């Protein structure tokens, strides 16, 4: 059973953060539960005909948008082990995230009212949502099927004019609908223009042959993956034909494209992970994944050539005690812009243990959060500089950045409460830090949630909470939307929620492994 969707006090808060080692951290407002029982439970009838396994009631990888007192969140609903989920879940709030109502968006055959073009799609992934100044909400996601017919996949756009309660004009973006795996769409993001009414932008990459399936797989050994762009200027009723904005050669691709807009001059910035041929030297290291960006000053008609900011130098995350992997936001950036002065903020996870072979090895994982900033439209960059790293070098991962009133916030997970030799569970916490001087210094670390057991999360190439989490300006502060497992410390062995996540192939007592929560941060 799911819990009521109002403030939920997790054990770490009730126990006074006894397991937290940081002496400067303070407790945050109790998280609010967003997600309830899966609205796609009936879709399990199709699971036996599909590859992989399904984790019912597993919600992961949320995105969110805020406009005044309206907040909208989206997430993967019923995550699958080898890509996507039964569908996309939606929550909307009319009180700034104090309470939530759930609804759905018809992107797969798991919804009763799915349009014919998507009726053969049984999976959805990568939700993104953004709200314009006029209150129109724009969403995008991947809709796909690994088996029928021949790995069909698409970037699908939708809009809402009632704060996320209902969605219409659900449609594949022109030039982003494919019937075979020769072309596979991935990692879409949608951004509403902050000053132009009825205008929004969607970006994604399309992986071109040879590839294996439209799973969200970032490996790039033998195909190409340009960045594509589409826009709407009629409030999401129609979208422009996809155009390439970052062209790529063989064995080169983009992934994690995200647009931010400077409201002072309507300059568009698209940030991406530009992955070049393996073992390409960069500034004294050997990294094939590079943080880069392009920009447009004419509404997306033309774009600059990619400018590389820094190598990602990311190894991913493993449990230091067991070697079991977690799937995290490695090789993906989070981006924000200060609307008052156009300053750009980019955060990502990295590893001080990065080696010249690139490959992760025993005893190596991402252990720091880095920040790069630009105050001149990307002409020059400060950093990357380390803004969070644990003294014991434990994993830290999946950062998210937002700016509000000149104040910068970054959220992240870390494993500071994992003890040497602790193998039965993987204590994980969610945190936020702040900067009031443009990212030069950081402090005021605040505890959001945990410790919870990461090893009870659904498995998708590792224990999975999401490639992204969400953080948005809200009022004078921020709204964080994130995922945690429901196995909180002290991990009682008799607690059904502390068993491994139940799937349709490996049933256990844990039929509700994860949920989506929100927290209002001051």
Task: Show the residue positions of the predicted features.
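C-terminal PAP-associated
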Residues: 27-522
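Secretory targeting and sorting signals
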Residues: 2-27
């Amino acid at each position: 059973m799911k819990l009521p969707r109002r403030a939920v006090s997790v054990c770490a808060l009730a126990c006074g953060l006894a397991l937290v080692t940081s002496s400067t951290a303070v407790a945050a407002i109790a998280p609010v539960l967003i997600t309830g029982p899966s609205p796609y439970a009936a879709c399990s009838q199709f699971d036996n005909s599909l590859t992989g396994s399904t984790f019912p009631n597993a919600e992961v990888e949320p995105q969110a948008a805020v406009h005044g007192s309206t907040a909208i969140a989206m997430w993967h609903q019923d995550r699958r082990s080898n890509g996507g989920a039964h569908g996309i879940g939606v929550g909307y709030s009319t009180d700034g995230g104090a309470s939530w109502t759930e609804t759905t968006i018809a992107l797969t055959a798991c919804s009763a009212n799915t349009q014919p073009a998507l009726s053969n799609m049984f999976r959805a992934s990568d939700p993104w949502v953004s709200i314009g100044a006029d209150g129109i909400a724009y969403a995008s996601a991947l809709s796909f099927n690994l088996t029928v017919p021949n790995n069909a996949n698409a970037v699908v756009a939708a809009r809402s004019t009632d704060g996320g309660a209902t969605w219409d004009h659900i449609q594949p973006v022109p030039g982003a609908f494919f019937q075979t795996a020769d072309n596979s769409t991935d990692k879409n993001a949608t951004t509403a223009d902050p000053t132009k009414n009825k205008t929004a932008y969607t970006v994604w990459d399309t992986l071109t042959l040879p590839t294996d399936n439209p799973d969200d797989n970032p490996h790039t050994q033998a195909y190409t993956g340009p960045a594509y762009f589409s826009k709407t200027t009629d409030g999401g009723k129609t979208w422009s034909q996809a155009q390439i904005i970052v062209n790529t050669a063989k064995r080169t691709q983009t992934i994690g494209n995200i647009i931010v807009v400077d409201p002072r001059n309507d300059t568009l910035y698209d940030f991406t992970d530009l992955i070049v041929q393996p073992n390409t030297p960069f500034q004294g290291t050997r990294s094939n994944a590079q943080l880069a960006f392009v920009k447009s000053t004419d509404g997306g008609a033309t774009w600059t050539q990619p400018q590389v900011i820094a190598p990602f130098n990311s190894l991913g995350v493993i449990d230091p005690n067991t070697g079991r992997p977690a799937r995290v936001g490695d090789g993906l950036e989070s981006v924000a812009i200060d609307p008052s002065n156009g300053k750009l903020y980019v955060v990502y996870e990295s590893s001080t243990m990065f080696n010249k072979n690139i490959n992760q090895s025993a005893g190596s994982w991402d252990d720091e959060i880095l920040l790069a900033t630009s105050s001149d439209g990307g002409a020059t960059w400060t950093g990357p500089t380390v803004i969070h790293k644990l003294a014991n070098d434990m994993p830290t991962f999946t950062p998210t950045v937002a700016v509000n009133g000149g104040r910068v916030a970054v959220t992240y997970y870390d494993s500071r409460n994992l003890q040497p030799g602790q193998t039965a569970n993987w204590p994980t916490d969610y945190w936020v830090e702040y900067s009031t001087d443009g990212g030069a210094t950081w402090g005021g670390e605040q505890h959001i949630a945990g410790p919870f057991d990461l090893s009870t999360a659904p498995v998708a190439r590792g224990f999975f909470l999401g490639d992204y989490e969400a953080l948005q300006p809200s009022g004078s502060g921020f709204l964080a939307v994130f995922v945690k497992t429901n196995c909180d410390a002290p991990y009682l062995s008799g607690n059904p929620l502390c068993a491994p996540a139940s799937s349709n192939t490996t049933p256990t007592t844990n039929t509700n492994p994860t949920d989506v929560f929100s927290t209002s941060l001051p």
